[in-house]
Structures are given as structure tokens and as C-alpha cells.
Amino acid sequence: MASSLSRLVLPFVPLLVVAGVGPAGALPLQVQPHDPLDRSCPGCDLRQADFRQAHLIGSDFRGSDLRGADLREANLEGADLTGALLEGADLRGANLTNAELSGVDLRNADLREAQVINAYAPNVRTSGMRYAGASLFGSNLIIGGGD
């Protein structure tokens, strides 16, 4: 009887798990979404990417092409953006605290209301960059840059 019952039920177990049905007292299945970038994507072509409100703490985007990317309110704390192309990127309200911004191209980027605290940023290209209301405390974003 038990073996015939298991032959009847076993083919439907995957469906029961997906539907959230399980044996009494069983814990619900917890699946974490897979991060395709795994917070590391040096040299990637991410033009026009949508990273709004993304948690990218400590990400590695060295040399990546993020031109025109939407990074509004993204958390890039401690991220390495060395040599990244962020021309025309929308970084309004983004957190770039302690980020590595050496040689970053921020021409025509929008950093209004962004937190750029203690960021290391020599040789940054800043022509046309908007930064009204941005917190630049402890950063050399403007001093270390230019075209």
C-alpha cells in the first residue's frame, strides 16, 4: 500500500513544492534570486542598464561601460569603478561612499543628491556633471578631476 501510494504521489512532489504545499510541519522552500552579475563585472558592457535601487555594495565594475545607465538610488558603497565609463549616467540619490572612482568618466552624469563621501577619485572627467545637493565630504571628486 505504501509503495503504491509513493508511486502515485512522487511524480507530483515538484508541483507540490512549487505550489507551496508540503507535509505538515515542513518549512516553506526559500529561494534567493540569483544575481547574474554576482556583484563582479569588470569590463562589462552595461550601457543603458537599469540598476535603480540596486544593492551593489563592493561591486567590481572596473573598466565597465555604464554610459547612460540608470543608477538612481543604487547603493554602490565601496564599489570599484576604476576607469568606468559613466558618461550621461543617472546617479541621482546614489550612495558612492568609499567608492574607488579613479579615472572615471562622469561627463554629463547626474549626481544630484548623491552621497559621494570619502570617495577616491583622481583623474575624473567631470565636464557637464550635475551635482547640486550631492554630499562630497572627504572626496576629491572635483579637485582630482577635469577633462
Language-model-detected regions and their locations in the chain:
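Short helix-capping/turn motifs at alpha-helix boundaries
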Residues: 1, 18-21
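Bacterial N-terminal signal peptides that target proteins for export
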Residues: 1-11
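Bacterial N-terminal signal peptides
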Residues: 11-19
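Tandem repeat scaffolds
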Residues: 22-147
